[in-house]
Amino acid sequence: MATTFTNRSSLSYGGNTVISNTVTGEIAEVLGVTKTAVTDEYRPGEPVTYIVTLTNSGSTELSALTLTDNLGAYTFNGTTLVPLTYDESSVKYFINGDLVAAPTVAGTSPLTITGLTVPAGGNTAIVYTATPNDFAPPAEDGTITNTVEITGTGLTDVTATETVATEDAPELRISKGLCPTSVTENGTIEYTFIIENFGNTAATDAVLTDTFNPRLTNIVATLNGTALTAGTDYTYDAATGLFTTVAGKITVPAATYTQNATTGAYTTVPGSTTLVVTGAI
């Protein structure tokens, strides 16, 4: 990208002043930068890989360049929050496609990498990962936009931005409980399954399968306190102990997220569904 400049002069003589014509020129920038995330989506706690590519259209090597990445910094209630945490020692450095020794990481928030070089007519790529933290928006339609700036003596500063969006999907976890843990022969036991959704989207297609051992008889199943009907809501093979819910019967609501007004950190309350199966052994 070129920067245009204009200039004109004045000439004074005998109490008079005349103005020259205006001349126009341009300064062609030789340094270019792009920034790309390997994936378009993020999930809190999972690293995002970024590639920053520098190009040199000039005939002279560019050296002693500095990269600064704001890691998605944004303002919340008057405070600057940084939703990405640079992953230590993750930097990879390529010059004209060849992997070379990693440059110096002079700071991590903002991420500052010094001593970069771009050969004449060539390119340099800096690859690193950063992990969304407690300040990264987790809800549907959340985004992180971060800006990288390249600076160097005698050069016009150049910038590039990249935006990644939340991965809108359920994230299920399940725990199983038994009560009582000690029971007499022909006694009754109760299995409790708690299914939690830490994702930002409801789960509508969960299927729970369990082979009860010892096998149960006369089973009763409830979902969130509502009785389930054998054959319609679940199947059970008394000969093998195999219990399976019908697809679509179990739904788990999305998690809810709250951003602390003071710290700006998000907290997660998972959506939850409880399945209880009771039977005799």
Range-by-range predicted roles:
Residues 1-281:
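Exported/extracytosolic protein signature
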